[in-house]
């Protein structure tokens, strides 16, 4: 099936943005030039569009420019609802023609659009809309966008009219089955530009220009559009030593809380501390792998250590960190996921490149840009599992508990982003803050798989199936597991949208497989027997030299910083005035 977009002269800007969104979702599009001199509209469209399996886009401005007049011809209305299985009506205006079109195609269920008032502040998503609105179903949030948002006036109610998204009880997004056609009505004036910079804007700021269109398109095209395979989540707690108590954190209490509220905690572990883990707590981790795990948190956790532009230094730091965590594994039996959480949220482009050639699965960060290049992310960057603009290495974003609200969770789930929650020991002074965030995640996405952060990164993939029966997998992490859960052999096409090319791709960590690489990314094909799984990993060659010995001064600085940080977390943090004075003193010292 294809999305058919008619145009007059040139594609209308709002339709062009819709096409870009559809293509971003993996949907095939066909643009059709309209001819004013072609005679009767139905006959022209039937000649011009041979496809029967299509979704026809109805932009009232375009149709009126083609047809003229103030009303939609009845003959054209009848043709549309009997010829196309889906109609997508969007960007209606406060015009007589638009009112005629809406009224005629909806059989009077909907009439004209109107702008919303200042008091109409919330989007209410129908609880019965999960098959269309996915994790947004049942949510209510705002504020609405008074520049973009309009609502339909209701002519007469009826069970056949589905009010999917409403503002103050009036439909903003609706659907209706008529004859052979499912008709989708979107009241927003505009479609979001995927390449527009949005920075850290809240979901509500761009929701009405992006999500209703994406919801409709994904529902219309089903498995032929990109969609998440499964939803993953993990709480990441930065810094603590693996001892019974660290600051306000008590691991026994955390385990009880995780069991009560159903979540998983990944400890962002500082490799410098590899000799200092308590046997009692490492035993607890080994016996509760479904609740506890580890990932990398820098090397020494010195100030901005991974924001350096010196690739040789970064290469050395990573080599030391890996050696330390291998020794920690031998001492404790605990595996450390190959995911990097940057200390203080600071990183450089060079750090991303070095992580890539060390074959890490990905980086996780709260700050979405390099320390020395404060770019603003676009909708395209955030409407997929990971940000790929930094040296083609995946950056997975996280938020703290307070900022992990229901709309943020739903956005992540809709676009396949793992829900990663960041906290430090001090959240356990009031642990209900974290517990409530876990409950919100489990409420919005009840089928969430709580896991270690490594599994969350590796399994946050998109999939679609094309009419030829090939299952397409778009991977973001360095490693991806592909499963055939059917009872027959299936063909898979696996892709990474990375500009940097690996030396080889390994199947199940040992067998090289044939792959293709070009300017668009990395591709390979695989046939999987029924009920089987395969793991595919990119293996990069490391071209960087090592820095050599880091020197006594750096080692001493790292040692002192770690001990002072522990004094701060274990003692000063429990005396606010002393902690404030210590932080002031810390800021005055050279880094």
What is each of the regions a protein language model found here?
Residues 1-52, 258, 267:
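Aromatic-Pro/Gly-enriched surface loop or interdomain linker
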Residues 2-3, 24, 52-53, 85, ...:
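A glycine-centered loop/beta-turn motif at secondary-structure junctions
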Residues 47, 200-290, 337:
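Active-site beta->alpha N-cap acidic-glycine motif
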Residues 62-135:
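A glycine-rich, often tryptophan-bearing local segment used as a flexible ligand/cofactor-contacting loop or short
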Residues 79-82, 88-103, 111-115, 264-355, ...:
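Metal-dependent polysaccharide deacetylase catalytic core of the NodB/CE4 family, i.e.
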Residues 218-221, 225-229, 253-273, 360-379, ...:
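C-terminal domain-boundary segment and adjacent tail
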Residues 218-249, 258, 330-341, 345-347, ...:
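Catalytic grooves of carbohydrate-active enzymes
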Residues 453-456, 463-591:
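C-terminal beta-sandwich/jelly-roll accessory domains of carbohydrate-active enzymes
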């Amino acid at each position: 099936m294809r999305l058919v977009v008619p145009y007059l002269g040139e594609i209308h800007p709002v339709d062009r943005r819709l096409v870009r969104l559809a293509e971003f979702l993996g949907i095939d599009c066909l643009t059709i030039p309209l001819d004013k001199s072609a005679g009767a509209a139905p006959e022209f469209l039937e000649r011009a569009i041979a496809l029967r399996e299509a979704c026809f886009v109805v932009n009232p401005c375009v149709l009126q420019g083609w047809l003229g007049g103030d009303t939609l011809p009845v003959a054209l209305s009848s043709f549309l609802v009997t010829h196309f299985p889906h109609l997508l009506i969007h960007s209606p205006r406060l015009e007589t023609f638009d009112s005629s079109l809406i009224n005629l195609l909806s059989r009077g269920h909907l009439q004209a659009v109107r702008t919303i008032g200042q008091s109409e502040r919330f989007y209410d998503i129908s609880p019965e809309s999960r098959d269309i609105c996915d994790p947004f179903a049942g949510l209510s949030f705002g504020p609405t966008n008074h520049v973009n948002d309009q609502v339909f006036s209701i002519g007469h109610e009826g069970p056949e009219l589905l009010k999917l998204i409403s503002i103050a009880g009036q439909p903003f997004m609706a659907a209706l089955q008529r004859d052979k056609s499912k008709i989708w009505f979107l009241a927003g004036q505009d479609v979001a530009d995927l390449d527009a910079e949005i920075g850290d804007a809240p979901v509500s700021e761009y929701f009405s220009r992006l999500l209703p269109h994406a919801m409709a398109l994904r529902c219309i095209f089903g498995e032929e559009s990109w969609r998440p395979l499964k939803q993953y989540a993990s709480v990441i707690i930065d810094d603590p030593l693996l001892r019974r108590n660290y600051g306000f954190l008590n691991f026994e209490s955390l385990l009880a809380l995780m069991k009560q509220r159903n979540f998983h905690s990944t400890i962002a572990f500082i490799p410098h501390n590899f000799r200092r883990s308590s046997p009692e707590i490492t035993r607890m981790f080994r016996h509760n792998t479904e609740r506890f795990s580890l990932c990398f948190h820098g090397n020494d956790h010195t100030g901005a250590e991974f924001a350096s532009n010196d690739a040789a230094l970064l290469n050395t730091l990573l080599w030391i960190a890996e050696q330390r965590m291998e020794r920690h594994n031998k001492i404790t039996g605990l595996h450390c996921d190959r995911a990097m959480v940057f200390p203080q949220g600071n990183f450089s482009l060079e750090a991303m490149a070095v992580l890539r050639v060390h074959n890490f699965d990905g980086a996780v960060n709260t700050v979405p840009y390099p320390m020395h290049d404060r770019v603003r992310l676009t909708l395209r960057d955030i409407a997929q599992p990971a940000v790929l603009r930094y040296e083609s290495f995946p950056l997975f974003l996280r938020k703290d508990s307070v900022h992990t609200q229901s709309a943020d969770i739903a956005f992540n789930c809709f676009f396949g982003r793992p829900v990663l929650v960041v906290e430090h020991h001090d959240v356990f002074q009031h642990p209900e803050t974290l517990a409530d965030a876990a409950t919100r995640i489990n409420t919005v996405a009840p089928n969430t798989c709580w896991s270690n952060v490594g599994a969350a990164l590796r399994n946050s993939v998109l999939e679609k199936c094309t009419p030829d029966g090939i299952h397409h997998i778009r991977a973001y992490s360095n490693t991806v597991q592909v499963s055939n859960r059917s009872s027959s052999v299936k063909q898979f096409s696996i892709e990474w949208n990375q500009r940097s090319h690996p030396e080889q791709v390994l199947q199940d960590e040992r067998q090289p497989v044939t792959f293709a690489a070009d300017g668009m990314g990395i591709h390979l094909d695989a046939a999987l027997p029924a009920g089987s799984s395969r793991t595919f990993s990119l293996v990069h060659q490391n071209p960087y030299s090592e820095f050599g010995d880091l020197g006594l001064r750096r080692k001493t600085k790292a040692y002192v910083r770690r001990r002072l940080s522990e004094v701060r977390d274990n003692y000063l943090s429990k005396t606010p005035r002393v902690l404030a004075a210590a932080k002031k003193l810390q800021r005055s010292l050279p880094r």
